[in-house]
Amino acid sequence: MVGGSRREHNLISKRFLSAVVLCAVIYGIHLQASSAASQGHGSITLDGVLRQLDRADKNFRSLSADVERTKVTVVVNDKSVETGSILVRGDKMLLEMKAPDARTILRTGDNLYIYTPGLKRVEEYNLAQHRSLVDQYLLLGFGTSGKDLQKAYLVTLLGERTLDGKKTAELELTPKSQEARNQISKIQIWLDESTWLPVQQQFNETGSGDYFIIRYSKVVPNPDLGDANFKPHWPKGTEKVKPQG
């Protein structure tokens, strides 16, 4: 029973971490979409990229985009892909994965919901209970300056690379806190140098060698989003659970 309880705890923790990291990724879009336009065609530097993050547009209000998430399990050479869409406004985020399996992740302040239609179940989490880990990942995005990013991560400019036909600047982030490194060893971000919007992000899991990649498309800054877009409405009969993660 103890072993079973531990496995259940690990499963809950992994599901929670996955949702938190997805939140961070989405806010990463917010951060880059808020940045100024291209800094020119000269050779880029780390300081130059960080300055772009320091110039995040204070008028940014909201965002919508399509998302593709690819999970790679190295030991069995397995690759799974899911696609969906996201809405972001302030500390609210709605991520709706549509294929191959429907799943909704809703964040409103300190509340996080994971709704699985196939199970007719919604899991409810309090982000405040995991504030240290959550803050570590959310530093990737919402309202984060280059200086704040450097406080939480060892930031390295890996160079420039053409990705999906776009010239990108590639950053590597290594978490400074041991708690974060226990989950994610490194993060890579590719930024389109013509717009400073993200093209791709990669999260490398600690120990296993597994990783997942997030690609963005159809990014629209400042769509008109109201509170109704972020209300936790679930179909009648949905089971509500609060896992202890």
Language model features: what each stretch is:
Residues 85-137, 208-212:
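An acidic-aromatic
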Residues 1-13:
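N-terminal secretory signal peptides that target proteins for export/translocation
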